[in-house]
Amino acid sequence: MTNFYKVFLAVFILVCCNISQAAVSFIGSTENDVGPSLGSYSRTHAMDNLPFVYDTRNKIGYQNANVWHISKGFCVGLDGKVDLPVVGSLDGQSIYGLTEEVGLLIWMGDTKYSRGTAMSGNSWENVFSGWCVGANTASTQGLSVRVTPVILKRNSSARYSVQKTSIGSIRMRPYNGSSAGSVQTTVNFSLNPFTLNDTVTSCRLLTPSAVNVSLAAISAGQLPSSGDEVVAGTTSLKLQCDAGVTVWATLTDATTPSNRSDILTLTGASTATGVGLRIYKNTDSTPLKFGPDSPVKGNENQWQLSTGTETSPSVRLYVKYVNTGEGINPGTVNGISTFTFSYQ
Protein backbone atom coordinates (compact mmCIF):
# COMPACT_ATOMS: atom_id res chain seq x y z
CA MET A 1 0.00 0.00 0.00
CA THR A 2 2.82 2.39 0.85
CA ASN A 3 4.51 1.91 -2.55
CA PHE A 4 1.22 2.66 -4.37
CA TYR A 5 0.91 6.09 -2.76
CA LYS A 6 4.50 6.94 -3.63
CA VAL A 7 3.95 6.15 -7.32
CA PHE A 8 0.69 8.16 -7.42
CA LEU A 9 2.35 11.20 -5.85
CA ALA A 10 5.21 11.14 -8.32
CA VAL A 11 2.85 11.05 -11.31
CA PHE A 12 0.81 13.92 -9.89
CA ILE A 13 3.85 16.13 -9.51
CA LEU A 14 4.96 15.40 -13.06
CA VAL A 15 1.56 16.37 -14.52
CA CYS A 16 1.40 19.51 -12.39
CA CYS A 17 4.72 20.83 -13.48
CA ASN A 18 3.98 20.48 -17.22
CA ILE A 19 0.91 22.84 -17.14
CA SER A 20 1.60 25.91 -19.37
CA GLN A 21 0.80 29.46 -18.22
CA ALA A 22 -0.16 32.32 -20.56
CA ALA A 23 2.73 34.79 -20.62
CA VAL A 24 3.30 38.48 -21.36
CA SER A 25 6.30 40.79 -21.12
CA PHE A 26 6.75 44.50 -21.82
CA ILE A 27 9.24 45.29 -24.60
CA GLY A 28 8.18 48.85 -25.50
CA SER A 29 8.76 52.28 -23.97
CA THR A 30 6.57 53.89 -21.33
CA GLU A 31 6.99 57.38 -22.85
CA ASN A 32 6.48 57.90 -26.59
CA ASP A 33 6.53 60.90 -28.93
CA VAL A 34 3.84 61.40 -31.57
CA GLY A 35 4.83 62.91 -34.92
CA PRO A 36 8.14 64.27 -36.19
CA SER A 37 9.94 66.80 -34.03
CA LEU A 38 9.46 70.40 -35.20
CA GLY A 39 7.14 69.41 -38.04
CA SER A 40 5.95 72.22 -40.32
CA TYR A 41 2.76 72.04 -42.40
CA SER A 42 1.12 74.45 -44.87
CA ARG A 43 -2.44 74.65 -46.16
CA THR A 44 -4.84 77.10 -47.81
CA HIS A 45 -8.51 77.43 -46.90
CA ALA A 46 -11.38 79.91 -46.83
CA MET A 47 -11.02 82.46 -44.05
CA ASP A 48 -14.12 81.59 -42.02
CA ASN A 49 -14.16 77.84 -42.67
CA LEU A 50 -13.64 77.09 -38.99
CA PRO A 51 -13.13 74.73 -37.34
CA PHE A 52 -10.82 73.71 -40.18
CA VAL A 53 -9.47 70.15 -40.19
CA TYR A 54 -5.84 70.65 -41.16
CA ASP A 55 -4.92 67.76 -43.43
CA THR A 56 -1.14 67.68 -43.06
CA ARG A 57 -0.79 65.46 -46.16
CA ASN A 58 1.13 62.95 -44.06
CA LYS A 59 0.40 61.20 -40.79
CA ILE A 60 1.23 62.84 -37.48
CA GLY A 61 1.36 59.73 -35.40
CA TYR A 62 3.17 56.93 -33.61
CA GLN A 63 3.15 53.22 -34.49
CA ASN A 64 4.89 50.34 -32.75
CA ALA A 65 4.10 46.69 -33.45
CA ASN A 66 6.28 45.46 -30.59
CA VAL A 67 5.10 46.79 -27.25
CA TRP A 68 4.18 43.55 -25.46
CA HIS A 69 5.46 40.04 -26.15
CA ILE A 70 2.67 37.49 -25.65
CA SER A 71 2.58 33.70 -25.75
CA LYS A 72 0.83 30.53 -24.56
CA GLY A 73 -2.75 31.56 -25.26
CA PHE A 74 -2.51 35.07 -23.79
CA CYS A 75 -5.55 37.25 -24.64
CA VAL A 76 -5.10 41.01 -24.96
CA GLY A 77 -7.11 44.11 -25.93
CA LEU A 78 -6.37 47.83 -25.67
CA ASP A 79 -7.99 50.78 -23.89
CA GLY A 80 -7.19 54.42 -24.62
CA LYS A 81 -7.69 57.71 -22.82
CA VAL A 82 -7.07 61.33 -23.80
CA ASP A 83 -6.09 63.83 -21.10
CA LEU A 84 -6.50 67.04 -23.12
CA PRO A 85 -9.62 69.19 -22.51
CA VAL A 86 -12.56 68.72 -24.87
CA VAL A 87 -13.30 72.06 -26.58
CA GLY A 88 -15.79 70.97 -29.24
CA SER A 89 -16.88 68.14 -31.49
CA LEU A 90 -16.91 67.29 -35.18
CA ASP A 91 -19.13 64.54 -36.57
CA GLY A 92 -19.44 63.03 -33.10
CA GLN A 93 -15.68 63.03 -32.45
CA SER A 94 -14.20 65.23 -29.73
CA ILE A 95 -11.95 68.16 -30.62
CA TYR A 96 -9.26 68.41 -27.95
CA GLY A 97 -7.69 71.76 -27.13
CA LEU A 98 -3.97 72.40 -27.52
CA THR A 99 -4.07 76.19 -27.54
CA GLU A 100 -6.84 78.77 -27.85
CA GLU A 101 -6.42 78.57 -31.63
CA VAL A 102 -5.47 74.94 -32.33
CA GLY A 103 -7.14 71.66 -31.40
CA LEU A 104 -6.70 67.99 -32.25
CA LEU A 105 -8.69 65.06 -33.53
CA ILE A 106 -7.19 61.88 -32.04
CA TRP A 107 -7.36 58.20 -32.97
CA MET A 108 -5.97 55.35 -30.85
CA GLY A 109 -5.84 51.63 -31.47
CA ASP A 110 -3.97 48.60 -32.75
CA THR A 111 -0.82 48.93 -34.82
CA LYS A 112 -2.57 49.93 -38.06
CA TYR A 113 -3.71 53.56 -38.31
CA SER A 114 -6.70 52.45 -40.38
CA ARG A 115 -8.12 50.55 -37.40
CA GLY A 116 -7.81 53.44 -34.96
CA THR A 117 -10.79 54.46 -32.83
CA ALA A 118 -11.92 58.11 -33.01
CA MET A 119 -11.54 59.34 -29.45
CA SER A 120 -14.29 61.15 -27.54
CA GLY A 121 -14.28 62.45 -23.98
CA ASN A 122 -11.70 61.83 -21.26
CA SER A 123 -12.57 58.34 -20.00
CA TRP A 124 -10.88 55.05 -20.76
CA GLU A 125 -12.50 53.42 -23.79
CA ASN A 126 -12.01 50.23 -25.75
CA VAL A 127 -9.82 51.03 -28.78
CA PHE A 128 -9.01 47.42 -29.76
CA SER A 129 -11.34 44.56 -28.84
CA GLY A 130 -8.45 42.10 -28.76
CA TRP A 131 -7.31 38.61 -29.71
CA CYS A 132 -5.71 35.51 -28.21
CA VAL A 133 -2.36 34.13 -29.33
CA GLY A 134 -2.23 30.37 -29.96
CA ALA A 135 -1.47 28.06 -27.06
CA ASN A 136 1.79 26.92 -28.62
CA THR A 137 2.84 30.14 -30.35
CA ALA A 138 4.22 33.57 -29.49
CA SER A 139 3.61 37.01 -30.98
CA THR A 140 3.58 40.69 -30.10
CA GLN A 141 0.90 43.28 -29.44
CA GLY A 142 1.41 46.79 -30.77
CA LEU A 143 -0.46 50.08 -30.78
CA SER A 144 -0.83 53.35 -32.64
CA VAL A 145 -1.81 56.97 -32.03
CA ARG A 146 -2.69 59.37 -34.85
CA VAL A 147 -3.68 63.04 -34.65
CA THR A 148 -4.98 65.69 -37.04
CA PRO A 149 -4.74 69.40 -36.13
CA VAL A 150 -7.86 71.54 -36.21
CA ILE A 151 -7.71 75.32 -36.50
CA LEU A 152 -10.28 76.73 -34.11
CA LYS A 153 -9.67 80.45 -34.41
CA ARG A 154 -7.90 82.79 -36.82
CA ASN A 155 -4.88 84.80 -35.80
CA SER A 156 -3.29 87.80 -37.50
CA SER A 157 0.05 86.12 -38.23
CA ALA A 158 -1.43 83.10 -40.09
CA ARG A 159 1.13 81.00 -38.21
CA TYR A 160 0.32 78.66 -35.36
CA SER A 161 3.01 77.13 -33.13
CA VAL A 162 2.33 74.25 -30.75
CA GLN A 163 4.74 73.18 -28.03
CA LYS A 164 5.35 69.60 -26.90
CA THR A 165 2.19 68.47 -25.13
CA SER A 166 1.13 65.35 -23.25
CA ILE A 167 -1.82 63.69 -25.03
CA GLY A 168 -2.88 60.64 -23.04
CA SER A 169 -2.29 56.91 -22.64
CA ILE A 170 -3.00 53.42 -23.96
CA ARG A 171 -3.15 50.43 -21.64
CA MET A 172 -3.04 46.73 -22.36
CA ARG A 173 -6.20 44.91 -21.23
CA PRO A 174 -5.81 41.15 -20.50
CA TYR A 175 -9.02 39.11 -20.71
CA ASN A 176 -10.36 35.57 -20.86
CA GLY A 177 -8.45 34.62 -17.72
CA SER A 178 -5.12 36.14 -18.80
CA SER A 179 -3.25 38.21 -16.23
CA ALA A 180 -0.49 40.78 -16.67
CA GLY A 181 0.78 40.34 -13.14
CA SER A 182 3.45 42.97 -12.47
CA VAL A 183 4.10 43.66 -16.18
CA GLN A 184 3.91 47.29 -17.34
CA THR A 185 0.45 47.74 -18.89
CA THR A 186 0.24 51.50 -19.60
CA VAL A 187 2.21 53.64 -22.06
CA ASN A 188 2.00 57.42 -22.38
CA PHE A 189 2.13 59.73 -25.39
CA SER A 190 3.27 63.31 -26.00
CA LEU A 191 2.77 65.32 -29.18
CA ASN A 192 5.99 66.70 -30.63
CA PRO A 193 6.10 70.47 -31.31
CA PHE A 194 4.93 71.61 -34.75
CA THR A 195 4.00 74.70 -36.77
CA LEU A 196 1.02 75.33 -39.06
CA ASN A 197 1.47 77.90 -41.84
CA ASP A 198 -2.02 79.00 -42.79
CA THR A 199 -3.00 80.85 -45.97
CA VAL A 200 -6.61 82.02 -46.07
CA THR A 201 -8.79 82.96 -49.02
CA SER A 202 -11.63 85.51 -48.98
CA CYS A 203 -13.61 88.02 -51.05
CA ARG A 204 -13.60 91.74 -51.78
CA LEU A 205 -16.83 93.74 -51.71
CA LEU A 206 -17.31 95.62 -54.99
CA THR A 207 -20.49 97.37 -53.87
CA PRO A 208 -20.03 100.40 -51.58
CA SER A 209 -19.95 99.35 -47.94
CA ALA A 210 -22.87 101.69 -47.16
CA VAL A 211 -25.88 101.29 -49.45
CA ASN A 212 -28.91 103.57 -49.26
CA VAL A 213 -32.13 102.16 -50.65
CA SER A 214 -34.76 104.79 -51.43
CA LEU A 215 -38.18 103.47 -50.45
CA ALA A 216 -41.14 104.21 -52.66
CA ALA A 217 -44.05 106.24 -51.32
CA ILE A 218 -47.27 104.24 -50.99
CA SER A 219 -50.71 104.70 -49.52
CA ALA A 220 -52.07 102.81 -46.53
CA GLY A 221 -54.72 101.41 -48.84
CA GLN A 222 -52.05 99.31 -50.58
CA LEU A 223 -51.58 97.33 -47.34
CA PRO A 224 -55.18 96.66 -46.29
CA SER A 225 -54.61 93.55 -44.16
CA SER A 226 -52.07 92.24 -41.67
CA GLY A 227 -49.22 90.53 -43.53
CA ASP A 228 -49.86 92.28 -46.83
CA GLU A 229 -46.69 93.37 -48.64
CA VAL A 230 -45.66 95.88 -51.30
CA VAL A 231 -42.21 96.22 -52.90
CA ALA A 232 -40.52 99.35 -51.55
CA GLY A 233 -37.07 99.24 -53.13
CA THR A 234 -34.25 97.07 -54.42
CA THR A 235 -30.45 96.91 -54.50
CA SER A 236 -27.63 94.49 -55.30
CA LEU A 237 -24.45 93.35 -53.56
CA LYS A 238 -21.45 92.23 -55.61
CA LEU A 239 -18.20 90.59 -54.57
CA GLN A 240 -14.94 89.38 -56.11
CA CYS A 241 -13.76 86.10 -54.53
CA ASP A 242 -10.74 83.84 -54.53
CA ALA A 243 -11.35 80.45 -56.09
CA GLY A 244 -13.00 77.90 -53.85
CA VAL A 245 -14.66 80.37 -51.47
CA THR A 246 -18.32 79.82 -50.62
CA VAL A 247 -19.94 83.03 -49.38
CA TRP A 248 -22.51 83.03 -46.61
CA ALA A 249 -24.19 86.13 -45.18
CA THR A 250 -26.10 87.29 -42.13
CA LEU A 251 -28.41 90.31 -41.89
CA THR A 252 -28.43 92.08 -38.53
CA ASP A 253 -31.06 94.53 -37.32
CA ALA A 254 -28.94 97.57 -36.42
CA THR A 255 -31.72 99.13 -34.32
CA THR A 256 -32.53 95.94 -32.39
CA PRO A 257 -29.51 93.58 -32.71
CA SER A 258 -31.33 90.84 -30.77
CA ASN A 259 -34.11 90.71 -33.39
CA ARG A 260 -34.34 87.22 -34.91
CA SER A 261 -37.59 87.74 -36.82
CA ASP A 262 -38.01 88.59 -40.50
CA ILE A 263 -39.28 92.15 -39.90
CA LEU A 264 -36.72 94.95 -39.61
CA THR A 265 -37.22 97.33 -36.69
CA LEU A 266 -37.90 100.92 -37.74
CA THR A 267 -35.47 103.54 -36.46
CA GLY A 268 -36.48 106.22 -33.99
CA ALA A 269 -36.55 108.72 -36.86
CA SER A 270 -39.53 106.92 -38.41
CA THR A 271 -42.95 108.51 -37.93
CA ALA A 272 -45.13 105.83 -39.55
CA THR A 273 -46.58 103.05 -37.39
CA GLY A 274 -48.19 99.71 -38.13
CA VAL A 275 -45.75 99.00 -40.96
CA GLY A 276 -42.43 97.15 -41.09
CA LEU A 277 -39.79 96.16 -43.62
CA ARG A 278 -38.90 92.71 -44.94
CA ILE A 279 -35.89 91.81 -47.10
CA TYR A 280 -35.92 89.10 -49.78
CA LYS A 281 -33.06 87.78 -51.91
CA ASN A 282 -33.27 87.07 -55.63
CA THR A 283 -36.54 85.26 -56.42
CA ASP A 284 -37.10 83.77 -52.96
CA SER A 285 -40.64 83.80 -51.63
CA THR A 286 -39.48 83.57 -48.00
CA PRO A 287 -38.07 86.69 -46.31
CA LEU A 288 -34.63 86.65 -44.73
CA LYS A 289 -34.41 86.52 -40.95
CA PHE A 290 -32.04 88.61 -38.87
CA GLY A 291 -29.15 87.18 -36.87
CA PRO A 292 -26.08 88.13 -34.82
CA ASP A 293 -23.39 90.33 -36.37
CA SER A 294 -20.82 87.52 -36.71
CA PRO A 295 -18.88 85.77 -39.51
CA VAL A 296 -18.75 82.50 -37.54
CA LYS A 297 -19.62 79.43 -39.57
CA GLY A 298 -23.14 78.30 -38.71
CA ASN A 299 -24.18 81.70 -37.33
CA GLU A 300 -27.90 81.93 -36.52
CA ASN A 301 -30.00 82.77 -39.61
CA GLN A 302 -26.92 82.73 -41.85
CA TRP A 303 -27.73 82.04 -45.51
CA GLN A 304 -25.72 80.96 -48.53
CA LEU A 305 -24.97 83.67 -51.08
CA SER A 306 -22.74 81.72 -53.49
CA THR A 307 -20.98 78.42 -54.17
CA GLY A 308 -17.25 77.76 -54.27
CA THR A 309 -17.29 77.79 -58.08
CA GLU A 310 -18.34 81.47 -58.31
CA THR A 311 -15.58 84.07 -58.27
CA SER A 312 -17.89 87.05 -58.98
CA PRO A 313 -21.01 86.33 -56.93
CA SER A 314 -23.86 88.78 -56.51
CA VAL A 315 -27.25 88.90 -54.86
CA ARG A 316 -30.33 90.98 -55.64
CA LEU A 317 -32.19 92.23 -52.58
CA TYR A 318 -35.80 93.39 -52.44
CA VAL A 319 -37.16 95.51 -49.60
CA LYS A 320 -40.91 95.23 -49.00
CA TYR A 321 -43.32 97.12 -46.77
CA VAL A 322 -45.39 94.80 -44.60
CA ASN A 323 -48.57 95.49 -42.62
CA THR A 324 -47.75 94.44 -39.04
CA GLY A 325 -51.42 94.31 -38.03
CA GLU A 326 -51.26 97.16 -35.51
CA GLY A 327 -53.13 99.77 -37.54
CA ILE A 328 -51.25 101.90 -40.06
CA ASN A 329 -50.58 105.57 -39.40
CA PRO A 330 -48.91 107.34 -42.34
CA GLY A 331 -45.43 108.80 -41.96
CA THR A 332 -41.79 108.19 -42.79
CA VAL A 333 -40.22 104.73 -42.71
CA ASN A 334 -36.51 104.17 -42.00
CA GLY A 335 -34.65 100.97 -41.17
CA ILE A 336 -30.98 100.01 -40.92
CA SER A 337 -29.61 96.52 -41.52
CA THR A 338 -26.00 95.42 -41.67
CA PHE A 339 -24.57 92.54 -43.70
CA THR A 340 -21.81 90.29 -42.40
CA PHE A 341 -20.13 87.97 -44.89
CA SER A 342 -18.60 84.65 -43.94
CA TYR A 343 -16.05 83.15 -46.33
CA GLN A 344 -16.31 79.39 -46.10
Swiss-Prot record:
The annotated region (Fimbrillin-binding domain) lies at: 200-344
**Could you tell me which cysteines form disulfide bridges?**
75-132
Receptor-binding lectin domain: region residues = 23-199
Q: Does the keyword Translocase apply?
A: no
User: Which sites bind a carbohydrate?
Assistant: 65-66, 110-111, 139-142
**Record-annotated membrane-spanning stretches:** none
For this UniProt record, give its keywords in alphabetical order, as a comma-separated list. Disulfide bond, Fimbrium, Lectin, Signal, Virulence
List where Polar residues composition bias occurs: 299-308
The record's listing under InterPro entries reads:
Adhesion_dom_fimbrial, Adhesion_dom_fimbrial_sf, Adhesion_dom_sf, Bact_Fimbrial_Adh_Pro, Fimbrial_adhesin_lectin_dom
Which top-level group of life is the source organism from?
Bacteria
Tell where it localizes. Fimbrium
Which GO terms of the molecular function aspect are on file?
Answer: carbohydrate binding
Ranges for the region named Disordered are 288-308
Region forming the signal peptide: 1-22
Q: Name one GO biological process term.
A: cell adhesion involved in single-species biofilm formation
User: Its biological function?
Assistant: Essential fimbrial adhesion factor that mediates binding to N-acetylglucosamine-containing receptors in the host intestinal microvilli, leading to colonization of the intestinal tissue, and diarrhea or septicemia. Also confers adhesiveness to laminin and basement membranes.
Q: Which family does it belong to?
A: Belongs to the fimbrial protein family.
UniProt protein name: F17a-G fimbrial adhesin
Which species expresses this protein natively? Answer: Escherichia coli
> What are the leading ranks of the lineage?
Bacteria, Pseudomonadati, Pseudomonadota, Gammaproteobacteria, Enterobacterales
